[in-house]
Design a protein with these regions (language model features):
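Glycine-rich beta-strand-centered segment in the early N-terminal region that forms part
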Residues: 21-39, 51-95
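C-terminal hydrophobic helical "lid"/dimerization subdomain
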Residues: 33, 262-307
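Short helix-loop-beta connector
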Residues: 67, 116-119, 142-148
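Mid-domain Rossmann-like dinucleotide-binding core that forms the NAD(H)/NADP(H) cofactor-binding site
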Residues: 84, 124-195
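A structural motif shared across PLP-dependent enzymes of the aminotransferase-like
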Residues: 95-108
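Glycine-rich cofactor phosphate-binding loops and adjacent beta1-alpha1 units
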Residues: 174, 186-251
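Rossmann-fold dehydrogenase core element
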Residues: 231-280
Length: 307
């Protein structure tokens, strides 16, 4: 099969497009014929990209791209809940090879039926971003009707789903984005959009119940001051310098695969409640452009196979 391989520690410049062995599913694994995989540039900084769960180094080459859409090509004898030929979307375990290849391995608990209303390229940007938004706002912050939520990076992959989900939960949604994306973010359901380039959000926002930070650094540090007493900040951006601070560690989380949540997200998408935001779609062999051309909205996607 063809795959995009990371042969050494580095960034997109360390990727190559080469032949690789087609994976074989174990008893509890699903082999997916990948049709689209989303680009997540932060994978180059993820711990699991270069380490095994025991802390030892992962051998190279490594395949990135841990959210995908495709069709089940084979299943192990112990698999239940999926059948060969099913159109699915989902995630891989962080510590195994990803989906920037013709085929990838996962487990039944990490995939769900692809939303019927979406093409594979659209579905591929959903799993990580939508589950991150869900687990941040619903599982951790317990966002409820009437609460005020501030979402940083609202035009991005996670932020765009978070705005839509918070709007669906009937919260009052305040978002930060560029002026160029203000109307777009309002269209997703934001009640107020702050141009982060011209207006310090802390100058116009106070007493929010929840902050979802997808940016980190100074943006996160300034966000503590706009929370009401007892409010909650949730962040997916943690830098080493600040991660030593207890409140940053407590606010940080990493998304986990969740089939039930994927099914609910799929239902909401097919009902028109939420929609994915795709930056640009690139053929697999143009993978370097997909990484280097940062989208103004959503995530870029690799088109890997023809349906």
């Amino acid at each position: 099969m063809k795959a995009i391989l990371l042969n050494q520690i580095g960034g997109p410049e360390s990727l190559v497009y080469e032949d690789a062995p087609k994976p074989v599913p174990k008893d509890d694994q699903v082999l997916v014929r990948v049709f689209a995989a989303a680009i997540t540039p932060t994978e180059f900084a993820w711990y699991p990209t270069f380490h095994k769960p025991d802390g030892s180094a992962r051998p190279f080459p490594v395949i990135l791209g841990h959210e995908f859409s495709g069709v089940v090509a084979a299943i192990g004898p112990a698999c239940t809940g999926v059948q060969v030929g099913d159109a699915v979307f989902g995630l891989n375990d962080w510590f195994i090879d990803g989906a920037q290849a013709d085929y990838c391995l996962t487990v039944p608990a990490n995939v769900a039926p692809k939303p019927a209303s979406l093409e594979h390229a659209q579905a591929a940007v959903v799993p990580i971003s939508a589950l991150t938004a869900w687990q941040a706002l619903v599982d951790r912050a317990h966002l409820s009707e009437g609460q005020r939520v501030l979402i940083h990076g609202a035009a991005g992959g996670v932020g765009s789903f978070a705005v839509q989900l918070a709007h669906h939960k009937k919260a009052h949604v305040i978002a930060t984005a560029s002026a160029a994306n203000a109307e777009f973010v309002k269209g997703l359901g934001a009640d107020q959009v702050i141009d982060y380039r011209t207006t310090p959000f802390e100058a116009v926002v106070r007493d929010v119940d929840v902050v979802l930070d997808t940016v980190g650094g100074d943006t996160r540090d300034r966000s503590w001051g706009v929370l009401r007493k007892g409010g909650q900040l949730v962040t997916i951006a943690a830098d080493a310098e600040r991660f030593s601070l207890p409140r940053v560690r407590d606010a940080f989380f990493i998304v986990e695969p969740n089939r039930a949540q994927l099914i609910e997200v799929s239902r909401l998408i097919d009902a028109g409640v939420m929609k994915p935001v795709v930056g640009a779609v690139f053929p697999m062999e143009r993978f370097r452009e997909a990484y280097e051309q940062k989208p103004a909205r959503g995530k870029n996607v690799l088109q890997i196979g023809e349906v």
